[in-house]
Amino acid sequence: MLLDAIEARIIGCLLEKEVTTPDQYPLSLNALTLACNQKSSRAPVMDLSETQVQAGIDELTKKRLVSEQSGFGSRVVKYKHRFCNTEFSDLQLSSAQVAVLSLLLLRGPQTPGELRTRAGRQHDFKDIAEVEATLTALASRETPLVVQLPREPGKRESRFSLTIVEATTGMTTHSVASQVDERDDSRIAALEERVAQLEARLDALLLQTH
């Protein structure tokens, strides 16, 4: 399982909102797009369109990490994660582990101190030791989910990064934008091919009528 930057943002948002706004979860495409583009608690800040978020959802659905849920009597399709703690997932995690993974998905590499400070709405860590124990558990799995990065000069704590996200270090807005552009190009090419096919079929039908 390897996620690109957009897929990581989507999963992170779904994990976060499931805990912080359970009455609004699962999320509609519009709500999920707003969550992805939040100015606070996100690094880098993204400016994704609903089309781009939908493309990410489609990829995650193929990976069986997201599923649709239609509301009772509602036409709006909503989405929920199948990343962990579901009957479909092999990952069964504690609330502390989910909070840490969500923060790393949404903000990239962080120190234990940063994780404790930012996790308040998802899990109330009593001290740094609890955060470190959580990180150790995630790093010690048969397939590790996090890895400790070398300590940077002048820093007291090492940062921890996810092993399931592409280019977890040095992720920039530019690289995300490039990834988005590539997705747009592929979708446009597919649409152009579809239009050409429909035009050919229409021409064939017109010939048959004459």
Curated annotation (Swiss-Prot):
Domain of life, source organism: Bacteria
Gene3D superfamilies: Winged helix-like DNA-binding domain superfamily/Winged helix DNA-binding domain
Similarity comment: Belongs to the UPF0502 family.
PANTHER family xrefs: UPF0502 PROTEIN YCEH
HAMAP family per UniProt: UPF0502
Protein name according to UniProt: UPF0502 protein Sama_1967
Organism whose genome encodes this protein: Shewanella amazonensis (strain ATCC BAA-1098 / SB2B)
